[in-house]
């Protein structure tokens, strides 16, 4: 196990180093608290601040913490956790390889083994898809589309890129960003996976700690986008009932109200939405929403999980994504992630434009 393996644990040769050492993962989680603690730190830091924490000074601990972290992510089995973890690992690798790429040849000869761009391209079968273009690089359009699909901003759209003979011109920095995306794909690949009971039992405390972090964290703090067509089926149904003026049971009103608060709607906006409902009372509705938000109570309430929605009969019209998601907010976040930013039209903006036209 070499330092480079620990810095880039997703590499094939890093995985081979672990296999060559005949490491028993079950024994590791049962007896090596240092590795388990570092694995927990990787995942918890990814959730809370988008990093993988500080690397451990011992190469063995740092490297083995990676597969254990993947086990923890699989046991938690929440989309937001998986996404944040993969992104954090990719960001950490990006910071390391961009620094190493920038290191001069002279310095490399006297320092530790480093990763170069050629090896990283080969790792993801991109060596034949990327060629030097003097002041930048050319990337085959298929590879480019795959790696640029999740990038934000017009500059990444194929229509805005120089395209010649099926190849897209990119700068060195842009190629590094595409490589970061390839790493994120590699980390995400296979997650979550089935974990043997013997290993899962040893990690019960760590999984509970991560679940507590997830429950306390305001995972939707960055969401301020209201796109009803991307709502989970349960919330679409409840919103439809509200807009049709149908009566909602208390638990149903609570569910849709917490969801709307969670995605960034203000109290006034939610009150306006509920005005068509026969059970509407502005003062009571405003109080309930402010109470949910934590303005009039010591507790900020979150949207019920799918299991709770099912128990109250509010879970309807399940689709394929529902099968893989355990929380309505996770469903909505994934839908937002999967939709091109230019296609996201906030419902509140539409309402404002209609009022202006009127």
Curated annotation (Swiss-Prot):
The keyword 4Fe-4S applies. GO terms for biological process: DNA replication initiation; DNA replication, synthesis of primer. InterPro entries: DNA_primase_lsu_euk/arc, DNA_primase_lsu_PriL. [4Fe-4S] cluster binds at residues 234, 306, 315, 322. GO terms for molecular function: 4 iron, 4 sulfur cluster binding; DNA-directed RNA polymerase activity; metal ion binding. The keyword Metal-binding applies. It holds the Pfam family DNA_primase_lrg. Binds 1 [4Fe-4S] cluster. Its cofactor is [4Fe-4S] cluster. Residues 338-358 have a biased composition (Acidic residues). Keywords: 4Fe-4S, DNA replication, Iron, Iron-sulfur, Metal-binding, Primosome. GO terms for cellular component: primosome complex. Residues 335-358 are annotated as: Disordered. Regulatory subunit of DNA primase, an RNA polymerase that catalyzes the synthesis of short RNA molecules used as primers for DNA polymerase during DNA replication. Stabilizes and modulates the activity of the small subunit, increasing the rate of DNA synthesis, and conferring RNA synthesis capability. The DNA polymerase activity may enable DNA primase to also catalyze primer extension after primer synthesis. May also play a role in DNA repair. Heterodimer of a small subunit (PriS) and a large subunit (PriL). HAMAP family: DNA_primase_lrg_arc. NCBIfam families: PRK02249.1-4. PANTHER family: DNA PRIMASE LARGE SUBUNIT. Belongs to the eukaryotic-type primase large subunit family. This is DNA primase large subunit PriL. The lineage of its organism: Archaea, Methanobacteriati, Methanobacteriota, Stenosarchaea group, Halobacteria. The gene is priL.
């Amino acid at each position: 196990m070499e330092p480079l393996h620990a810095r880039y644990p997703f590499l094939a040769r890093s995985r081979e180093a672990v296999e060559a050492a005949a490491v028993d993962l079950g024994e590791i989680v049962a007896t090596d608290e240092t590795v388990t603690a570092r694995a927990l730190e990787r995942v918890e830091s990814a959730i809370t601040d988008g990093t993988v924490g500080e690397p451990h000074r011992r190469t063995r601990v740092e490297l083995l913490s990676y597969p254990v972290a993947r086990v923890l992510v699989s046991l938690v089995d929440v989309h937001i956790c998986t996404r944040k973890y993969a992104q954090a690992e990719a960001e950490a690798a990006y910071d390391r390889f961009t620094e190493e790429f920038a290191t001069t040849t002279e310095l490399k000869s006297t320092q530790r083994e480093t990763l170069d761009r050629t090896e990283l391209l080969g790792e993801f079968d991109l060596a034949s898809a990327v060629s030097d273009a003097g002041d930048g690089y050319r990337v085959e359009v298929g590879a480019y589309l795959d790696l640029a699909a999740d990038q934000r901003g017009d500059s990444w759209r194929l229509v805005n890129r120089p395209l010649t003979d099926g190849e897209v011109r990119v700068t060195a920095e842009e190629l590094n960003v595409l490589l970061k995306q390839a790493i994120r794909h590699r980390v995400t690949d296979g997650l979550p996976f089935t974990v043997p009971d013997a290993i899962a039992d040893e990690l019960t405390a760590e999984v509970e700690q991560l679940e507590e972090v997830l429950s306390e964290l305001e995972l939707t703090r960055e969401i301020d986008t209201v796109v009803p067509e991307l709502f989970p089926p349960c919330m679409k149904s409840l919103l439809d009932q509200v807009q049709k003026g149908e009566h909602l049971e208390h638990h149903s009103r609570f569910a849709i109200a917490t969801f709307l608060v969670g995605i960034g709607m203000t109290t006034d906006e939610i009150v306006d939405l509920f005005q068509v409902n026969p059970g509407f009372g502005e003062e009571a509705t405003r109080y309930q929403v402010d109470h949910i938000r934590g303005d009039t109570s010591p507790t900020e309430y979150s949207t019920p999980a799918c299991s709770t929605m099912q128990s109250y009969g509010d879970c309807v019209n399940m689709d394929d994504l529902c099968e893989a998601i355990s929380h309505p907010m996770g469903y909505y976040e994934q839908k937002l992630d999967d939709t091109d930013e230019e296609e996201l039209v906030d419902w509140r903006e539409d309402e404002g434009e209609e009022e202006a036209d009127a």
